[in-house]
């Protein structure tokens, strides 16, 4: 049975994000993946701090200075018979809810682990988020050109700490200066590594079969024997790859390689296009939407300000869930119940924009936004429904923002509200005074906010500590009790960027006592957009 042209396009799409701890090599992998997708001809090396060859996916000013990826960029490239959408997420020490929300827009994730260090803190946090939706995970053990931990130990650690079975697809031969290549367990082939080929796609020498004398000649008898011994162990002790279990998020195929040396990345990409799911169905508040439906639907998972310093604009990123986008089509923005014509949607190659004529499920569109689109907005061709599961998290860190020039209060508020709509930070306006408090998931966000207020809104601000330990969104079905709660706790109440009532607690003890005192009031840690 031949599929209709529309369904063929849907079946070709793969949408994934990379999750990792800072410095595990995520940006380098992104580069190499794009190199294989022929999207960039020579891969820009990330770190040379002053070098002009910046990695292609880190494009905001502050990222260029610090060598880290702060904003989620989107890149589309062809690979084999598929069209792959890669959503790049911030990888540095400190990241924002952007990262969490980006994971709601993908169908699959690649987990990158520094094989010298194993599972690290940020990887754990991000894996918890993918678990909420049982997202399928592929794993790349990176940095084999350095000395690494024992590969079996690494697999055990992933299984025990992240509660997901490991099915090795390739297996390393040596590491560090002795790294010779990898053996593919399912193809019975050894791929030999050559150094110094990191910037290009190399012709790899392949040796067929484990008992081939060529293997001993190529890697040395000791390493060849070690490989055979290890493989006996591996085949006895580890999981076989099982596609059903992979799609259920219970087992992860594991690849070994070095992104810097551009080796092993293609094996992982082959696995991605072969095994990762085509665009998946999504829940709304009324029904499940399937990718094969012909009517257009999509949701906004991120807003990015000023992608183009020349045009002080903001762009809303929308994941297409079903149907085909065509230039100039009419869509309904469900939250405000208004029909809009979208004639100038964008696709991205990190920072380079091109206008798009059509897009399919799994693709990410950029919509020009003049303040009317919010995170979590659903667009349809008229049906009134809302996609669910796009979270807002209660921040864990708080600072008061203070102006150096008090006359700029209006610009400051405008800047903070726009940054909060974008999800870069959350802003709270206490009811009892004129303070402006910002809340974030990580410390670096405060620096980002101050830098962006200055460069984009021309506002000089500083942040200082404030007596807030945590925040909760509050609501109550009993209006009378809610009024009493508001009257007695006015000092602790604030409005967030979307004018939702929030309780800002000076200590956790205060929060617990208040919750006990007002059992009818709900204190929420997350809020649906």
From Swiss-Prot:
Domain tr-type G residue range list: 11-280
GO cellular component, one term: cytosol
InterPro entries the UniProt entry points to: EF-G-like_DII (IPR053905), EFG_III/V (IPR035647), G_TR_CS (IPR031157), P-loop_NTPase (IPR027417), PrfC (IPR004548), RF3_C (IPR032090), RF3_dom_3_sf (IPR038467), RF3_GTP-bd (IPR041732)
TM helices/strands, residue ranges: none
The UniProt record lists the keyword Ubl conjugation: no
GO biological process: regulation of translational termination
Keyword field: Cytoplasm, GTP-binding, Nucleotide-binding, Protein biosynthesis
Cell compartment(s), UniProt: Cytoplasm
Gene Ontology MF terms in the entry: GTP binding; GTPase activity; guanosine tetraphosphate binding; translation release factor activity, codon nonspecific; translation release factor activity, codon specific
UniProt family annotation: Belongs to the TRAFAC class translation factor GTPase superfamily. Classic translation factor GTPase family. PrfC subfamily.
Stated name of the protein: Peptide chain release factor 3
Gene designation per UniProt: prfC
């Amino acid at each position: 049975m031949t599929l209709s042209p529309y369904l063929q396009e849907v079946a070709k799409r793969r949408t994934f994000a990379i999750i990792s701890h800072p410095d595990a090599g995520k940006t380098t992998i992104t580069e190499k993946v794009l190199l294989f997708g022929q999207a960039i001809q020579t891969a820009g090396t990330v770190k040379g701090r002053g070098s002009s060859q910046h990695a292609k996916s880190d494009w905001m000013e502050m990222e260029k200075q610090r060598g880290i990826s702060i904003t989620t960029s989107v890149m589309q490239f062809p690979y084999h018979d598929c069209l792959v959408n890669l959503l790049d997420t911030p990888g540095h020490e400190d990241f924002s809810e952007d990262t969490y929300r980006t994971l709601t827009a993908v169908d699959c994730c690649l987990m990158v682990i520094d094989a010298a260090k194993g599972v690290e803190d940020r990887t754990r946090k991000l894996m918890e988020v993918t678990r909420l939706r049982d997202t399928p995970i592929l794993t790349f053990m990176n940095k084999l050109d350095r000395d690494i931990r024992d590969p079996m130990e690494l697999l055990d650690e992933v299984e025990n700490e992240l509660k997901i079975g490991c099915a090795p697809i390739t297996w390393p031969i040596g590491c560090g200066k002795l790294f010779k290549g990898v053996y593919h367990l399912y193809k019975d082939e050894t791929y030999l590594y050559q150094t110094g080929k990191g910037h290009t796609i190399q012709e790899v020498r392949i040796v067929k079969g484990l008992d081939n004398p060529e293997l001993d000649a190529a890697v040395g008898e000791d390493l060849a024997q070690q490989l055979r011994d290890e493989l006996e162990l591996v085949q006895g002790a580890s999981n076989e790859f099982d596609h059903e279990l992979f799609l259920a998020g219970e087992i992860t195929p594991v690849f070994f390689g070095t992104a810097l040396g551009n080796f092993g990345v293609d094996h992982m990409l082959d696995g991605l296009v072969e095994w990762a799911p085509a665009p998946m169905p999504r829940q709304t508040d009324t029904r499940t939407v399937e990718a094969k439906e012909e009517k257009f639907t999509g949701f906004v998972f991120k807003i990015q300000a000023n992608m183009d310093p020349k045009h002080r604009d903001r762009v809303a990123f929308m994941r297409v869930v079903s149907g085909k986008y065509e230039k100039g089509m009419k869509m309904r923005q469900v939250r405000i119940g208004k029909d809009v014509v979208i004639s100038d949607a964008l696709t991205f190659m990190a920072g380079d924009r091109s206008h798009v004529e059509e897009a399919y499920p799994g693709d990410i569109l950029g919509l020009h936004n003049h303040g009317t689109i919010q995170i979590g907005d659903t667009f349809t061709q008229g049906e009134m429904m809302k996609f669910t599961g796009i979270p807002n998290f209660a921040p864990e860190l708080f600072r008061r923002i203070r102006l150096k020039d008090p006359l700029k209060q209006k610009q400051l508020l405008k800047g903070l509200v726009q940054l909060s709509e974008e999800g870069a930070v959350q802003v709270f306006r206490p009811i009892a005074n004129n303070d402006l408090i910002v809340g974030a998931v990580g410390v670096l966000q405060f620096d980002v906010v101050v830098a962006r207020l200055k460069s984009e809104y021309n506002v000089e601000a500083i942040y200082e500590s404030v007596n807030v330990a945590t925040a909760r969104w509050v609501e109550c079905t009993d209006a009378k009790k809610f009024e009493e709660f508001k009257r007695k706790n006015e000092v602790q109440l604030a409005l967030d960027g979307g004018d939702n009532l929030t309780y800002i607690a000076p200590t956790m003890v205060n929060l617990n006592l208040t919750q006990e005192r007002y059992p009818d009031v709900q204190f929420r840690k997350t809020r649906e957009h």
